[in-house]
C-alpha cells in the first residue's frame, strides 16, 4: 500500500469517507482495511458487512478477501444492496408479511402482473403477493419499511453488522441511503469509498449529494483522499484532470501518475469526415497496434521498458449511446476483428435472455454445467422461434436467442453447475456483468458500462456536441445534466492505461436526419499540447489488411 492507502486502511473505528480517484487502488484499499481490522484489531469477520453495486464487484471483493484472510473471509457478509435486502427479508419473512418461500418475480410474471394492473402500483404488488412473488426493485424498499416499523430489528442488525463498508458511495439512491442510515448509527463504523466525479447514474435515481454530506450525517467523520494513480500515463491523467476541472466536486482535484514514462504518447485526436471514416480510423489503428507493423505500434513499454504488442483483448471502444456501436462493429467485422459488445442495460431486458431463463427453470431436473445447459436451451429455442406458430408472437428471433447465448456464456462458465445462482444473476445483473475478460476480442462499451473497467488502449468515439454532452432534439440540458455528462467524459478518459484516442465527426445521422457536428466543448478544457493531431497525414489503409490479421 502507498502512504495514503495505508492511512485509510489502518484508520481507527468510527465513520470514514475515502475519496478515491480513478485508478488509485480503491478495491485494494477497501480489502486491506477489512483485513487490517480483522487481523490486527480483532474485529470478528461475522461483524463485517461489505456492500457493492454489482455482483461482479462483490465477487472480486470476496476473492481478494480470501487471498488476504484465508478461510475466515467466508464469515464476512459481502453482497449487493439487493442481496443484503434479500437476506433481511428471508430472515424476517413472516414479520414482513411474506410467505417463507417467496420468490423474485421473473420477467414473464412481472409483465403479466403489469398488464393486468396497468399503472396501478398497489394492484400490481397485490397480484405479485397473491402468487408469493416480490419484484426485484422491492428488495431494498421492503427491508427499509420493515426496519422503520421494527426498531428491535434495527438493533439486531446493528449488533450483527458492527462494521459496514460501502463501495461506490457516490451511486447510492434515496432508498439505499435510508437502509444504510438504519443499519449504521451516526457514530457507527461506516466506511464509504468512492469518487463524486464519477457519479453518472442520476437516471437510475443515484444522488451524489449523499456523498458530499457524509460529514454532516456522521459524527466526527474522517476524510482520506487517494490521489496516486496506478493505471494511466501522465498525458492521459493531465487531460482527464483538466477535462473535469470546470465542474469537479472534489476540492483541489488531482491525480498523480505513479508511472514515470517520459516517452508516453500524447492523446491521439482524430477529426473524422463521417461515421464511416471514424470507424475506419478505429480499424486502421487497431490493425497497426495489433500487427505492430508501423511506427505507431504501442511501445510505451508497459512498465518494463520493452516494446509490447497489443492483443485484441487490450482494446476498448467507448461511446455515449448504444446506437453508435453499429458502424464500428460492422467495420471491425469486415476486417475480421473479433468483438464483444456490452451495454449498461439490465441483462433481463436483452431479447432472448428471459426465454433462456424460463427454459432453464422448466428443465430444472437436468444436471450438467450451466454453460452446457444454456447452449442446449439456445438450440431448442432457436428452432422453436424459427418456425412461426401462434404462441411465438413475442417478437423474439433465433438471432436474438444466439446473441443472448453469447452474452450469457461467460457468466454461465463462472457459475459452474449452480443454476440458481445463474438465474439470480440474470435477474439482478447488467449486460456488462457478463463480460468475458479473457476473450480475445475488442470490447465495445457504452461509457456507463465501462465504469470500473480499464484497458491498455481506449478509443472514445463520437466526442461531439449533442452526443457528449448528450442533447435530445428540442431540449436544453440543465447545468446539473451537463456536469454529469462531463463526469461521464472523465470516466471514459480514465479507463485508458497506455493509449487514448478521441475522435469526432463532421456529419452524423441523428434522429433521422444528417446533421453538421462540432467537437465536444469538453475537449476545449484540455490543453492543445496534450493532443497529437492524427489524420492530417494518415497513411491510407494497406490493401492486405485482411491477410495480415488472419
Region locations from a protein language model:
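P-loop NTPase Walker
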Residues: 1-98, 131, 155, 238-241, ...
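Conserved helicase C-terminal RecA-like lobe
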Residues: 311, 325-333, 350-530
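Short, polar/flexible loop-turn hinges at active-site or ligand-entry regions and domain interfaces
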Residues: 42-47, 67-76, 92-106, 126-132, ...
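Helicase P-loop NTPase motor core
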Residues: 24-30, 34, 220-222, 229-337, ...
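Conserved beta-strand -> loop -> alpha-helix junction used to position metal-binding or nucleic-acid-contacting
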Residues: 73-88, 337-359
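Acidic, low-complexity intrinsically disordered tails
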Residues: 532-550
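Conserved helicase NTPase motor core
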Residues: 1-10, 14-22, 28-30, 49-50, ...
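Short glycine-/polar-rich loops that comprise or flank the Walker A/P-loop
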Residues: 43-47, 74-75, 186-189, 195-197, ...
